[in-house]
């Protein structure tokens, strides 16, 4: 849909599921891609969460107090999704939320077999 707004979330069918975290510094359209397998309610909410400024719950600076990330089990090319954010570069809201829509599931991007 067309808009006269300068800053907006541009939701489109893409190759992957992604959105920038928060508003772009320079403004303008912010892409939110919903690729194959990305159109379930939870994934759409997750990507919208990124678009309004929420980081992954498992990337919190204090995440090691709540969970263990086995980086050797992460699919190649997705290691960045599990990096811990610096405390002075992000803000946490409340306690760690194991039920957060911003927390990847147990086997998300897992390269092994179950």
From Swiss-Prot:
<feature type="disulfide bond">
    <location>
        <begin position="17"/>
        <end position="38"/>
    </location>
</feature>
<feature type="domain" description="Peptidase M12A">
    <location>
        <begin position="1"/>
        <end position="114"/>
    </location>
</feature>
<dbReference type="GO" id="GO:0005576">
    <property type="term" value="C:extracellular region"/>
</dbReference>
<feature type="binding site">
    <location>
        <position position="56"/>
    </location>
    <ligand>
        <name>Zn(2+)</name>
    </ligand>
</feature>
<keyword id="KW-0479">Metal-binding</keyword>
<dbReference type="GO" id="GO:0006508">
    <property type="term" value="P:proteolysis"/>
</dbReference>
<feature type="glycosylation site" description="N-linked (GlcNAc...) asparagine">
    <location>
        <position position="88"/>
    </location>
</feature>
<keyword id="KW-0964">Secreted</keyword>
<comment type="function">
    <text>Zinc metalloprotease. Provoques deadhesion of endothelial cells from cell cultures, and also degradation of fibronectin, fibrinogen and gelatin in vitro. Its role in the venom is not fully understood but it might act as a spreading factor that facilitates diffusion of other venom toxins. Alternatively, it might be involved in the proteolytic processing of other venom toxins or it might play a role in extra-oral digestion of prey.</text>
</comment>
<keyword id="KW-0482">Metalloprotease</keyword>
<dbReference type="InterPro" id="IPR024079">
    <property type="entry name" value="MetalloPept_cat_dom_sf"/>
</dbReference>
<feature type="active site">
    <location>
        <position position="47"/>
    </location>
</feature>
<keyword id="KW-0800">Toxin</keyword>
<keyword id="KW-0378">Hydrolase</keyword>
<keyword id="KW-0325">Glycoprotein</keyword>
<protein>
    <recommendedName>
        <fullName>Astacin-like metalloprotease toxin 4</fullName>
        <ecNumber>3.4.24.-</ecNumber>
    </recommendedName>
</protein>
<dbReference type="GO" id="GO:0090729">
    <property type="term" value="F:toxin activity"/>
</dbReference>
<comment type="subunit">
    <text>Monomer.</text>
</comment>
<dbReference type="GO" id="GO:0004222">
    <property type="term" value="F:metalloendopeptidase activity"/>
</dbReference>
<feature type="binding site">
    <location>
        <position position="46"/>
    </location>
    <ligand>
        <name>Zn(2+)</name>
    </ligand>
</feature>
<keyword id="KW-0862">Zinc</keyword>
<feature type="binding site">
    <location>
        <position position="50"/>
    </location>
    <ligand>
        <name>Zn(2+)</name>
    </ligand>
</feature>
<dbReference type="GO" id="GO:0008270">
    <property type="term" value="F:zinc ion binding"/>
</dbReference>
<dbReference type="Pfam" id="PF01400">
    <property type="entry name" value="Astacin"/>
</dbReference>
<keyword id="KW-1015">Disulfide bond</keyword>
<keyword id="KW-0645">Protease</keyword>
<dbReference type="InterPro" id="IPR006026">
    <property type="entry name" value="Peptidase_Metallo"/>
</dbReference>
<dbReference type="InterPro" id="IPR001506">
    <property type="entry name" value="Peptidase_M12A"/>
</dbReference>
